[in-house]
């Protein structure tokens, strides 16, 4: 399934950081949603800034425009403020992209658990993310760190409890 | 031996002497450096051969010395400061080349020398063994640099105080000659000074401005003596030169008569050009246009700005406007900014996108003004920009 680019993607000014404040706000909002939807589509959970420059998201070869490093940083900062991005290092070279926030994942997982009547059962993390049963679910293939955070969110809500077992972690749903 | 000789000289040559010379031991003082020496030189007192034998002449930074070749203890010198000027005399048949050196009269407190009096005011050095070209060159150098002025030697050498001292004691044709020569040199020096170094010219220009300022102030003080007419004329000369005259501003307040008149004149003059150019002109364009039309009595930039500033208060149909970037324009009052921006948006939408240059061409505006208009439209949110290696383009704001 190919990715559907938004109309801004082919609009050259999209790749220039606009000086007019109002225009810039709209521009950044469009960028944020583009980055998130692209990452969701490709199931990307981490981004490397230098690599990102060459990625099709920030580099539209067809109209020969690319977003400058400074502008990319601005977009990432905007995502961070919204809670969709977390820097992995002080130099801001790698980051976690949360096109869905942990709470949202947690909700999805819990919905599946309760729909299948598996409340009160125990799962290993591996089962949840990579098991055959969950193959059709959106959270299938979820990276460990995100899975853990989502379960932690559920835990805070009192809907789950993370257990440490012999060969890893597991979770019990209530 | 030395004393003997001295007495002999004094006795024999009481009348015709080179009286500026002093006896010296021939040793150089501290701070005094040897420049050049030449043997085979005979001294002449004016046109007459000095009754000294052939010797060697030595040029130092401070003095001209001559030493007898046969009798080394016979050495005389003269300070370079005594030299007024010198020239070459070409060799002839049977005659060696010479350097003629004109001197100041001997001062009262001069030390004893080989001659007491001399009727001549110049001496000659005759170069029997050549060497005059180099010697002349070095002498010129030393006389230009005047190094003896910077590092005075301990021995008290009576120094000439310059052309002025010479002038007061000069008599006869020689004196007149000397005066003319000094004047010529002075003029020459001034001219070469002024042209040699442009910064010096600037200083002189500053002096001129100071001078005219002081005259203006004097006029202010003596208001009664000079007629009103003349004062105004003088002030207008100063203004047309571009010299701000504080007098006028104080006496008439801001918005002086001159500026008011000027503003009215500009109001008439600029109507047609402004309409041709779509109602707006950069101030620099106005400046060029106005001064070209005037021919004489040009406007200074300051005057133009001051006149433009009072358009509004005089209810003239023109306005001076300053953009964010600092660009100043004169525009017709009837010129509406909203209209301009709306039309700009139409133009850009029509063509999809425009650069400042393309827009300027389209409207017949200067590129500077075209850019200002596009920037204004962007500020209003009607346009957005595309900045790439291809340049700066403006698009309709679709965000």
UniProtKB/Swiss-Prot annotation, chain A:
Keyword Transport: yes
Gene Ontology MF terms: protein homodimerization activity; structural molecule activity
Subcellular localization: Cytoplasm
InterPro entries recorded: ESCRT-II_cplx_Vps25-sub (IPR008570), ESCRT-II_cplx_Vps25-sub_N (IPR014041), WH-like_DNA-bd_sf (IPR036388), WH_DNA-bd_sf (IPR036390)
Record keywords, A-Z: Cytoplasm, Protein transport, Transport
Protein's GO biological process: protein transport to vacuole involved in ubiquitin-dependent protein catabolic process via the multivesicular body sorting pathway
Pfam annotation, one family: ESCRT-II
GO cellular component: ESCRT II complex
Lineage top rank: taxon: Eukaryota
Free-text function comment from the UniProt entry: Component of the ESCRT-II complex (endosomal sorting complex required for transport II), which is required for multivesicular body (MVB) formation and sorting of endosomal cargo proteins into MVBs. The MVB pathway mediates delivery of transmembrane proteins into the lumen of the lysosome for degradation. The ESCRT-II complex is probably involved in the recruitment of the ESCRT-III complex.
Subunit structure, as described in the record: Component of the endosomal sorting complex required for transport II (ESCRT-II), composed of SNF8, VPS36 and 2 copies of VPS25.
Record family assignment: Belongs to the VPS25 family.
Protein name, as recorded: Vacuolar protein-sorting-associated protein 25
Organism of origin: Danio rerio
């Amino acid at each position: 399934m190919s990715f559907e680019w938004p109309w801004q993607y082919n609009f050259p000014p999209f790749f220039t950081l606009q000086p007019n404040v109002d225009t810039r706000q709209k521009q950044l909002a469009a960028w944020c949603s583009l980055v998130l939807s692209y990452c969701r589509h490709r199931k990307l959970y981490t981004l490397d800034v230098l690599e990102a420059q060459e990625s099709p998201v920030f580099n539209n070869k067809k109209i020969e425009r690319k977003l400058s490093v400074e502008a990319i940083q601005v977009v990432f900062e905007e995502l961070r403020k919204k809670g969709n991005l977390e820097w992995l290092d002080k130099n801001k070279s790698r980051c976690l992209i949360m096109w869905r926030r942990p709470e949202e994942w947690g909700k999805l997982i819990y919905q599946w658990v309760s729909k299948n009547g598996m409340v009160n059962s125990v799962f290993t993390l591996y089962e949840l993310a990579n098991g055959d049963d969950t193959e059709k679910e959106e959270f299938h293939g979820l990276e460990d760190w995100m899975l853990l955070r989502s379960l932690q969110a559920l835990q805070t809500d009192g809907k789950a409890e993370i257990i440490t077992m012999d060969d890893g972690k597991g979770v019990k749903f209530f | 031996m030395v004393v003997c000789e001295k007495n002999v000289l004094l006795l024999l040559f009481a009348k015709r002497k080179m009286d500026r010379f002093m006896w010296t031991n021939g040793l150089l003082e501290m701070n005094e450096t040897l420049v050049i020496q030449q043997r085979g030189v005979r001294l002449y007192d004016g046109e007459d051969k000095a009754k000294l034998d052939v010797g060697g002449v030595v040029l130092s930074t401070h003095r001209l010395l001559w030493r007898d070749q046969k009798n080394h203890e016979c050495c005389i010198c003269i300070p370079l400061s005594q030299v007024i000027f010198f020239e070459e005399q070409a060799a002839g048949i049977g005659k060696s080349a010479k350097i003629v050196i004109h001197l100041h009269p001997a001062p009262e407190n001069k030390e004893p020398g080989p001659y007491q009096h001399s009727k001549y005011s110049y001496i000659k050095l005759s170069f029997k063994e050549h060497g005059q070209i180099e010697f002349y060159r070095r002498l010129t150098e030393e006389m230009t640099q005047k190094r003896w002025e910077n590092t005075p030697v301990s021995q008290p050498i009576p120094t000439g105080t310059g052309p002025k001292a010479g002038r007061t004691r000069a008599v006869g044709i020689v004196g007149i000659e000397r005066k003319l020569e000094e004047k010529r040199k002075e003029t020459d020096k001034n001219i070469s000074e002024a042209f040699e170094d442009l910064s010096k010219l600037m200083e002189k220009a500053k002096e001129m401005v100071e001078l005219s300022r002081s005259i203006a102030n004097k006029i202010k003080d003596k208001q009664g003596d000079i007629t009103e007419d003349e004062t105004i004329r003088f002030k207008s000369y100063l203004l047309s030169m571009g010299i701000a005259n504080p007098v006028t501003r104080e006496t008439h307040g801001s918005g002086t008569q001159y500026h008011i008149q000027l503003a009215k004149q500009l109001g008439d003059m600029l109507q047609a050009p402004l309409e041709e150019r779509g109602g707006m002109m950069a101030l620099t364009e106005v400046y060029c246009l106005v001064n070209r039309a005037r021919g004489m009595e040009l406007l200074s930039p300051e005057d133009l700005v001051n006149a433009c500033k009072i358009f509004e208060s005089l209810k003239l149909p023109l306005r001076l406007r300053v953009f964010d970037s600092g660009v100043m324009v004169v525009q017709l009052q009837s010129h509406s900014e909203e209209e301009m921006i709306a039309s700009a948006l139409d133009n850009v939408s029509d063509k999809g996108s425009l650069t400042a240059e393309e827009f300027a061409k389209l409207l017949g505006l200067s590129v500077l003004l075209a850019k200002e208009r596009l920037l204004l439209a962007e500020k209003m949110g009607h346009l957005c920009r595309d900045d790439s290696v291809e340049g700066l383009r403006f698009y309709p704001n679709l965000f």
